[in-house]
């Protein structure tokens, strides 16, 4: 990668499952569709489709009753849609992974504890980062999405403490973060502005999108400027980080993308042409909104 002048490498340490959603076509009031995660649907998959051993022990009795009622209400087609929605989040392919293959790999992954996985990440960083530093490459780990355990699989890049752990495991300018406001923002416990302020010099890549969190633990991917993520405060903190870098004579450019977007207008007619979440029109709209927000904040801070 370095030989081809790729200086920022985004990667993740999510086992088996990449980003996980239970509905890839959640209808919004404006007619667009978005990605949604519902813990009720996820638990139904976990217990009744994946049939993870002792899965019920991870949920309380009241919630288990709700899951049972929910699953019984699903038609055969709806069960199939739920399964496909979850298995679509497998890394490295646009094809659905076979459920039996998923079950086999899932059992292997469950044998790795959270502590062991963190040890593995620290080992990886200590082996990779010194070489990356020599080559001038910035490694930018992406947060877990969603930022909590799913189907019993541990998550280790999901909150402030875990980000601090991996940065402290191998202190280096090349050991850094992809700041994803959507992934981290799915948890109300994550203070996104504090993460930027405290780890700003280690942010090498930025993914900006919003999520709307609901009281039942579900969330959907909202419009970029509307939702539970205070995007104006996040953008202000990012611009302030760039100003700090400029004052120190450091590189201030941070690659940014609008991340996922809604399915809008003509994109509704060609959903087979793009990966879920990566619509052209929805992401272009998000980029325009974020660029305008950045411009306004930058002008107000520098004027």
Question: What residue spans do the PLM features occupy?
Answer:
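Histidine-acidic metal/acid-base catalytic patches
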Residues: 2-8, 17, 43-53, 59-65, ...
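Metal-cofactor-binding active-site regions of metalloenzymes
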Residues: 8-13, 42-43, 67, 73-80
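Aromatic-lined carbohydrate-binding surfaces of glycoside hydrolases
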Residues: 11-23
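Flexible glycine-/small-residue-enriched beta->alpha junction loops
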Residues: 21-51
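Generic preference for hydrophobic/aromatic residues in regular secondary structure cores
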Residues: 35-38, 82, 245
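Residues that cap or delimit alpha-helices
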Residues: 60, 71-79, 83, 200
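Helix-loop segments that flank and shape redox-cofactor active sites
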Residues: 145
């Amino acid at each position: 990668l370095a030989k081809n002048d790729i200086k920022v490498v985004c990667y993740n340490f999510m086992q088996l499952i990449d980003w996980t959603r239970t509905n890839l076509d959640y209808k919004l009031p404006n007619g667009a569709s978005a990605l949604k995660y519902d813990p009720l649907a996820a638990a139904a998959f976990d217990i009744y489709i994946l049939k993870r051993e002792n899965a019920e022990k991870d949920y309380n009795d009241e919630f288990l009753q709700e899951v049972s009622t929910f699953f019984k209400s699903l038609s055969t087609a709806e069960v199939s849609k739920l399964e496909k929605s979850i298995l679509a989040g497998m890394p490295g392919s646009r094809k659905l992974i076979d459920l039996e293959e998923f079950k086999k790999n899932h059992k292997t992954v469950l044998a790795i504890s959270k502590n062991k996985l963190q040890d593995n990440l620290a080992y990886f960083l200590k082996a990779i980062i010194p070489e990356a530093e020599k080559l001038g490459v910035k490694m930018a780990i992406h947060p877990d999405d969603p930022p909590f355990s799913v189907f019993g699989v541990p998550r280790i890049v999901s909150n402030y403490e875990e980000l601090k752990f991996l940065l402290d495991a191998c202190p280096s300018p090349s050991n850094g973060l992809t700041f994803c406001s959507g992934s981290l923002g799915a948890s109300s416990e994550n203070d996104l502005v504090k993460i930027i302020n405290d780890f700003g010099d280690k942010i090498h890549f930025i993914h900006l999108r919003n999520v709307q969190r609901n009281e039942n633990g579900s969330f959907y991917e909202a419009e970029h400027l509307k939702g539970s993520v205070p995007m104006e405060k996040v953008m202000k903190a990012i611009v302030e980080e760039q100003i700090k870098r400029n004052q120190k004579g450091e590189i201030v450019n941070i690659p940014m993308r609008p991340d996922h977007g809604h399915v809008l207008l003509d994109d509704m007619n060609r959903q087979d042409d793009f990966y879920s979440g990566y619509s052209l029109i929805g992401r272009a709209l998000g980029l325009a909104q974020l660029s305008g927000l950045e411009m306004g904040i930058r002008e107000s801070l520098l004027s």
